[in-house]
Amino acid sequence: MSPVEWKVAVGTETTTAVYEPGTRTSAEVPIFVCAHGAGGNMSDRSMLATVRAFHEHGIGVVRFNFLYKEKGGSRPDSMPLLMQTTAAVVARVREELYPDRLVIGGRSMGGRAASMLAADGFAADGLLLLAYPLHPAGRTA
């Protein structure tokens, strides 16, 4: 199955998400919703390598842009907006795909946003963090 692109509403704005189906069903393995890091976007080399690695194991991945990247910016959105964007993409995944199991996460800042959603009680079957920042940028503790 070919990748499927969606426009996802985030408040009054929209962003792009791409679902790349795996070869195994979500009853066997979860779908992974993967957010990019601060310096990247959903189509950068590290994100595409992540998607390939999951596909080698038959796992479907949804990748998306945060709003600032969708607009071509370089300064990340506020953490509440990053979390809202992630939640909106997950809601769209649930509407479109009805996954049996769903894991949220991402690279660096994207993983941080997903972990903060999970800490707030956001419903997901798992949390996967890649290159997770242990502290905010510019601070060592």
PLM feature spans:
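Primarily recognizes the serine-hydrolase "nucleophile elbow" in alpha/beta-hydrolase
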Residues: T86-A141
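Serine-hydrolase catalytic machinery in alpha/beta-hydrolase-like enzymes
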Residues: E5-R101
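Basic/polar N-terminal segments that are highly enriched at the extreme N-terminus
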Residues: M1-S2
